[in-house]
Structures are given as C-alpha cells and as structure tokens.
C-alpha cells in the first residue's frame, strides 16, 4: 500500500524519481510497470501499478457503453492512459500532455492513495490540503460514517 505525501523534483526532461521506499513494492507488484492517466475529478494525475490499472480497466470495459457518461469516463481515463516503467535509476517520464493537464512544473507532490499515487503541482496540493482540513473541521461537516473512522 502506498501512503504519504512526498515532495519531488521534475527534471528538465520531465522525469520524476520514485522515492526508494516505494520501488520494491512497485517491482514486486508490477515489475516496475505503471500506468499514468488524468484524474477525472481533480487537476492531478493518477499513477497506478500495472496490476492495479488492469483491475480498473476491466471495470471500465464492463460499463454499459450506451450511456454517454460511461463513454465519457472511458475516453478520459483510457484515452489518456500512458504506460510507464521505472528506469535503472528509479525514474519515470511524465508525458508532456499529462504534465500540462496537471500543471506540473518543477515541484511535484507524489501522494500515496493506498492502491495508487496522485501527482500534484506542489502549490495546488498545499492549497487543497489546507482547504480540506478547514472544511473537515467545520462543525457538522463530517458525515457519521467518517466520524467513526477517526482514531
């Protein structure tokens, strides 16, 4: 499982170095093969080990294609999906089109989301994290099922 938020640098060629603490798990789960695609809700990218992406792809394939919203989601996620592989130095190349979508420049946040990562522009991530914290702290803002999760 992938956890934590990691500030990493995007180099001039559009490569990111995967933090070493995740590399063994990525190697064992998918031989370092990953898929990156857009997040259909937030202005970030989703980075999946290939084995996880194949599960999502199967669910997308099973959606009823006569519904426009299903086709739209399939086009967005599958149409923007790109195969990636860690190189010998643990780096991977983020395609220019996807970097533009997420507005990734020099400083990037790699955020573990259990079965995947999100890639955020650092400033966008910090603003969202602050807004999320403020929203969840408002009285009555948290649904009962989430209140039960808090330790």
UniProtKB/Swiss-Prot annotation:
Keyword DNA-binding: yes
Single GO MF annotation: transcription cis-regulatory region binding
GO biological-process terms attached to the record: negative regulation of DNA-templated transcription initiation
Pfam family, one: MraZ
GO cellular component: cytoplasm; nucleoid
Disulfide bonds listed in the record: none
All residue ranges annotated as the SpoVT-AbrB domain in the record: 5-52, 81-124
Protein name: Transcriptional regulator MraZ
UniProt organism field: Pseudomonas syringae pv. tomato (strain ATCC BAA-871 / DC3000)
Lineage of the species this protein comes from: Bacteria, Pseudomonadati, Pseudomonadota, Gammaproteobacteria, Pseudomonadales
């Amino acid at each position: 499982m992938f956890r934590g938020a990691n500030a990493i640098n995007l180099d001039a060629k559009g490569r990111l170095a995967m933090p070493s603490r995740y590399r063994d798990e990525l190697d064992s789960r998918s031989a370092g093969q990953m898929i990156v695609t857009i997040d259909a809700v937030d202005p970030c990218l989703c980075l999946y080990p290939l084995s996880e992406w194949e599960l999502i792809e199967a669910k997308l394939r099973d959606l009823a294609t006569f519904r426009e919203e299903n086709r739209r989601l399939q086009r967005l996620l599958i149409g923007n999906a790109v195969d990636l592989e860690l190189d010998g130095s643990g780096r991977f190349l983020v395609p220019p089109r996807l970097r533009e979508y997420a507005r990734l420049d020099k400083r990037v946040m790699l955020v573990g989301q259990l079965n995947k990562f999100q890639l955020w522009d650092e400033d966008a991530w910090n603003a969202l994290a602050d807004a999320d914290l403020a929203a969840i702290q408002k009285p009555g803002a948290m649904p009962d099922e989430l209140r039960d999760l808090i330790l």
